[in-house]
Amino acid sequence: MVRLLQPKHMVQAVNALHWRNSVEFHKLLKDNGDFSICFNSEQVLPQKISVEKMVKMLPRHLIAVVMTPNKDGKSRYILCGIRLLQTLCDLTPRNAKLEQVLLDDVKLSAQMIDLVILVIIALGRNRKESCNSNKESLLEATLVASCLHLFHGFISPNSQDLVLVLLAHPRVDVFIDSAFGAVLNVVISLKAKLLYRQTDSPKKLGASSVEEVNFHCQQAEAALQFLHSLCQHKPFRERVAKNKELCGKGGVLRLAQSILSLTITPEFVGATVTIASTSRMKAKVLSILQHLFEAESVSFLDEVANAGNLHLAKTVASEVLKLLRLGLSKASMATASPDYPMGFVLLNAMRLADVLTDDSNFRSFFTEHFSMVLSAVFCLSHGDFLSMLCSSDLSSREDDANVDYDLFKSAGWILSVFSSSGQSVTPQFKLSLQNNLTMSSYAHQRTSLFIKMIANLHCFVPNVCQEQDRNRFIQNVMSGLRKDPSSILIKMLPGSSYTPVAQRGTGVCRNLGSLLRHAESLIPSSLNEEDFLLLRVFCDQLQPLIHSEFEESQVQVKVKKLFALLYIGFTILWLICLVTLIQDIEGRGGNLSGKLKELLNLNNEEASEDCDVRVEGVMTKQGVNEEIDTVERLKESDADASNLETSGSDTSSNRGKGLVEEGELVQNMSKRFKGSASGEVKEDEKSETFLVFEKQKKKRKRSIMNADQMGMIEKALAEEPDLQRNSASRQLWADKISQKGSEVITSSQLKNWLNNRKAKLARANKQTGPAHDNNSSGDLPESPGDENTWQQKPSTPIKDQTVTETPKTGENLMRTSSSSEEGIKQGQQVRLMDERGDEIGKGTVLRTDGEWNGLSLETRQICVVDVMELSESYDGSKKMIPYGSDDVGRTFTEANSRFGVMRVAWDVNKLQY
């Protein structure tokens, strides 16, 4: 039996021999044939020690040191012992006797496993929120990485063999929890150090500071790399997924959150090494999460949800979304130097997102946020879109690498920092590239993962998904297409990389078609047929919405430009005519002021019936203004008639027909104005022009009900005034009146007709006073396009007319105060009312015309109001607003968050002023 050494002899041997590398150790053993070694200690005389005794005693000795209370130098001494053990393990292939003593002894191997597990438990027991001093944090990071990699030295460099040994150990669950905790502590101290460096000026950062940051980052990467290698094997990751401490209490998620949130600035020299190292760490932790989420024995995410830590998982999902935005923004750009591989960050983020989008806990989160990223990608120019997702030969790709960790060098560097001998050169570890993917395979995987995420979010499972989420994803994509794509993706691409707004509809549809064709070529090698079919359904549903959205907006823009040009042209024409008139009067020596007053008096009783005051064939300002006003009224009338005419079944053919007719109308108007300016228009031509207006009105008006049907509804309203709100009764009357006409009247069409009737009665009350019979429409036209809009001024001048005024009663006074010839004006104070007539709040009118977030204010008879205060009975966070959307908000509180004020669109007939 070998006699064991005394502890003091072991301490001397460890302190003296850990500086010797395996080559030097081998030479010392050869010089002494009795399997002993001489070393110089603090004593004057050299000492000789039996290697066999030292090897058998060393693991037990270090375990005893670990179990002792904390004292100065304890961590450094343990690291010295770990370093010496690694040197002995490296020497075993060249020394058979040492191999027999160190590796073949089962009991000794078990002691070494216990040693590593105890050290890791001690390092990972307490979760840190802040780091120790700079040197202590570096020492702890090195000790964690060294202990984990010592397993490869005395068990096997193959991680599969290591998994089998660890799973057979009785304390494997405690080790797994402590190992993740120890790595988390290393990352937390690194994160604190990086945040501190960001506040430093670059001039204050010396070479030593940069080296320390790089060294710390490499130790953290090496420790995480060890855990990642174990999680590559199914038995180990299944054991991790079952660990309640890691899964239920969120240990793995905290580690992932800490790593994914690492941020550094490239201001200091050598940052490239650190940037690449942190990026590879993010890629590895994403891969670990993906493996754990796909565990078969237990649902990792369900365990997290049951433990009440789903908020941690959503924080990680948010970081994944940031990586997707950044990665897709850089996907078509050149990557960093090949000397510093960044890891498969984008690819692993997409793999993890594929898992999360298929989970009910995260479906709504990615539907809300990833749809915005998706729409921005679809807005890329066709060339950039093809190079990113529809190509097998990419201009750039991600590269992955593993650190060839050198335990002896790492421990030696940090120990030299504490010794009086001074600091040595920081070790730079070699990187072994792990690119087992060809360029085409990488490109196909990236495209297939992109398609799988679309398929997961667009797929509707009735038993799992809520009914309100049926079309939510595609609606969010449409909402994203209306936004600026550069505000969604990280602003790294030039503006030319995106399709112009005027061509967005065509460009997005073209990109969708290219993606479909390329996806079909990936079946079945990279993409399954089910995901492809879901992509096709998504494209088939999205393209009609795109055509409807962007073609209609383009038509509106063109019509607006046309009317703006007409207005400018008519104004210039009138000014030219006015200048010519003034010059002519001055040339004749006439009274300029008197004649101008006579000619330009718009309310002159001797003016012609159509108010076209002409002097030598020149049309004055009033004639021009009335013509323009007529065109505007026709435009509004056409829009209203189109709304009633379609009743939810508007078609592109009807819109196209309307455009042709408007074009003919504008041509006739243009001819008339040209003729009026030159004095060449005759009375019969003038009459013919107005016949064109009447013809346009009659052509566009299409009554959905005949006189008998309207009579039936009027009688029904007399008996049941609330018919508009009673859906069952409304459906019954729709069926009844359908039997009296040539067309089938639906309940929604009848409701639309009743709404229009109610609006006309309200406008008639404003302009002519209250109707005598509330249930009779009188001579009100059916279509809202057949009467002037709510903002129209009275067409007949009332000044200088002799009329008999009716004394104003209290009712008349109230009506006069709440309406005017001008209608609602910008800046006017108003009260907002609900359907029951109750006051909701008070505000100021912001806009009354034009468009606001896709709403035509004149056509829909609405205006934009800034609400200053809400009634006490209403909760702004719960009260839904009309015309709500993702862009403007759906409640008063959401509107306030969008604009900084509660800005809403409100029906004019529900405003009091």
From Swiss-Prot:
Residues 698-765 bind DNA. GO terms for biological process: flower development; negative regulation of antisense RNA transcription; root development; seed germination. Coiled coil: none annotated. GO terms for molecular function: DNA-binding transcription factor activity; sequence-specific DNA binding; single-stranded DNA binding. Signal peptide: none annotated. Keywords: DNA-binding, Flowering, Homeobox, Nucleus. Regulates COOLAIR, a set of antisense transcripts originating from the 3' end of FLOWERING LOCUS C (FLC). Associates with single-stranded DNA that is part of an RNA-DNA hybrid, or R-loop, that covers the COOLAIR promoter. R-loop stabilization mediated by NDX inhibits COOLAIR transcription, which in turn modifies FLC expression. It comes from the Eukaryota. InterPro entries: HD, HTH_NDX, NDX, NDX_C. Residues 643-655, 765-778, 786-829 have a biased composition (Polar residues). Expressed predominantly in dividing tissues such as young leaves, root tips, flower buds and embryos. The keyword DNA-binding applies. This is Nodulin homeobox. It is found in: Nucleus; Nucleus, Nucleolus.
